[in-house]
Amino acid sequence: MNSIIGGTDPLSMIFKEEEIKKQQILLEKEEKEKQEQQQKKLNKDNIFKLEEEGKKLELSTKVHIQHPNISTTSDNNSLLDPSNLTLNGKKKKWINSFCIINFDLEIGQVLDYSFPQVNFKEEESTNLCFLSFPDSNSHLQGDIIYSFKLKETSSLGNGQCNFQYGYVFFRQEKDSSISRGYLQKSVVLLSDESFVGLFKKVMEIVGPLYFDHGNTLLEVAYQNIMNWPELKLGQTYELPILGYILTFHVPHTRGTPHIIDPVVKQHQLGGGSGGGLSSSPSSSSGGGNIPTSNTTGVSPSIWSEMKLVSNLKSIDIYGCFKSFTTKLWMLWELVLLGHPLLVISPNPPMCSDSVLALVSLISPLHYCGDYRPYFTIHDTDFHKYTSFSHLSGTRPDDSNNNNNQDDSEYNNNNNNNGIPPSILGVTNPFFLKALGNWPNILTIGTTQQRLGGFKKIKSSLPNIMSKDLLTRHVLDNKEKILSEYKPFISPDKSVLKKITESADDDIINEVLRTHFLQLTQKFLIPLERYFSLLLPLAKTISIFQRPPRLKPFIKEECLNKIMETDERFIIDNKSKEIELYKQFLDCVNFKQWLDDKRAQAIKHLNILYRKAILDADIHTLLRGKPISTATDLLKRVEDQLILEENLFQTSKEIKDKFKSHIEIIRQYKNNCDNNNENNNNNILLTSPIKSTSLSSIALPPSSTTVTTKTTTTTK
């Protein structure tokens, strides 16, 4: 009976084993349920993160559509960022000068006048004159506006070059008083800023009025612009110019062309006259032909158009590439990866607009190759580019071939014949011979477009073409993309459907700009995630230490992170997506992106460090700290004050705060020095050992000698 109660009988043992098994099953079930709950929570968190990223993407898209080049990751705490106060801490000019380029029958293009006077070197002056005129023979009359980049002959220390941006109003009309029978003259605005939308609108106003009022008009216009508010990044301004007000938002970043048009209003002065505009035969060349001057006031059609100018009305992607809508994704890749592109067009406006539209395709990324919206055979860099074309070879395949190729065929995507990343816009067919074996050539624009009409022309060319056939092809105004590049990404069917269903070109342009902006942002998501792992934590910022450094960006590690995730960012085929990222990490656009991200992160860390100093309770932080710590801190705060006084336009209030901190630290150091001195004296006076040795040291040497002698004598 006792053994039964004690549970040692076989039945009890079996019962215990069953109980143990039941408990194990329950524990396993609980553990499984716990894991399932954790997985659900993890999935929920991931979905939430994706939704948050989607919201951020949607928000930044809306912001960027209104203002391309706006920093979608910038810190909003501009009060703490001294670099937001001005450009490089000093007042920046909106423009450099106005120039007049005339055609002289004996010497050709010549710089007639400039205000303020420019001091160009001979090469720069030559480039300016040729860039300010169409590089092709044409007897068409009218006005055109386009833009170019003017290279300065002196290079920077880092191997890069300075550029000015030129905005041209060119007029050609019959004039019997001129021996050639035609007036050919250009008004040019030169600026360090690539505000294409703004300055093309300025030239629409200034150009026609110049031909009525002469050089004095340019001086007045220049003074108007010099009276504009100080140029600061990220600000919105109302800018008066010759009776009009241009509402313009300055982008948050510099370097990439800012192609958004400003909103235009007219002053209500003297019955509304102030240099009115009237319409002339328009061209579809991206705003090529423009209104001409008229003293009778503003034509109702033009005025209504001007009032309707919105921030969405920019360089027209659809207008430039209407014949290549299915190839826009391939063009996006070519620009993204920095492949060289030659754009051939019949006129400078379409040429320059097409190049700028290509560069803007990868926004908000900065295109870091050498892009020239308009390039001529007389440019001093012409021989540099022809030197890259000495290699012989067959023409690229027709890009209309089937792109569903095996992955092994993508190894030819980097075959650029040693040509650096560049996009050249040209109008002279001679470039087809000079740069005949550039790997990617885009011929755009037809005679119908040049005359105002637009007709889509399809061509059936052989896959491999000779240079002569290619030249005839361009001279016949056939539009084509000639490239052997095999794209990774396929056209978006939903976007193509919207294009076919819409009859409004402005809506189509907005759809395309939004799509490619989001495409670039989605492409950057894994790179942004990896870069965030390189950043130090904000809690590591301490006023007693310099801001922490960033970890190095390791390409292989980044690619492994992308491989490990199951997400597809822009391509369904994972191997193709990895290959696209691999090629991007080796191109110049990535290098600039990484440099910009590092600079932005370091800047942010410095802002946090600056904020930590400003917000610090120095009395509390120094309590109990050794004098060496106070000395180091004093040096750091003094260095920061030097930066505030010399590089930044810091307010007096903030500078006084730094000075107050410096005074507190100095007082603390003085107190430490005094305390140490007092402590040393107290130690010397109170310690018996030290007192004895002190008294022994104080005794005269003779007294010691005498005592010794006396002792000896006594003995």
Curated annotation (Swiss-Prot):
<protein>
    <recommendedName>
        <fullName>Protein DENND6 homolog</fullName>
    </recommendedName>
</protein>
<dbReference type="InterPro" id="IPR018307">
    <property type="entry name" value="ABL9/DENND6_dom"/>
</dbReference>
<feature type="region of interest" description="Disordered">
    <location>
        <begin position="269"/>
        <end position="296"/>
    </location>
</feature>
<feature type="region of interest" description="Disordered">
    <location>
        <begin position="392"/>
        <end position="416"/>
    </location>
</feature>
<comment type="similarity">
    <text>Belongs to the DENND6 family.</text>
</comment>
<dbReference type="GO" id="GO:0005085">
    <property type="term" value="F:guanyl-nucleotide exchange factor activity"/>
</dbReference>
<keyword id="KW-0175">Coiled coil</keyword>
<feature type="domain" description="dDENN">
    <location>
        <begin position="478"/>
        <end position="600"/>
    </location>
</feature>
<dbReference type="InterPro" id="IPR037516">
    <property type="entry name" value="Tripartite_DENN"/>
</dbReference>
<dbReference type="GO" id="GO:0055037">
    <property type="term" value="C:recycling endosome"/>
</dbReference>
<dbReference type="InterPro" id="IPR024224">
    <property type="entry name" value="DENND6"/>
</dbReference>
<feature type="compositionally biased region" description="Low complexity">
    <location>
        <begin position="399"/>
        <end position="416"/>
    </location>
</feature>
<feature type="domain" description="uDENN">
    <location>
        <begin position="96"/>
        <end position="273"/>
    </location>
</feature>
<feature type="domain" description="cDENN">
    <location>
        <begin position="299"/>
        <end position="476"/>
    </location>
</feature>
<dbReference type="Pfam" id="PF09794">
    <property type="entry name" value="Avl9"/>
</dbReference>
<feature type="coiled-coil region">
    <location>
        <begin position="13"/>
        <end position="58"/>
    </location>
</feature>
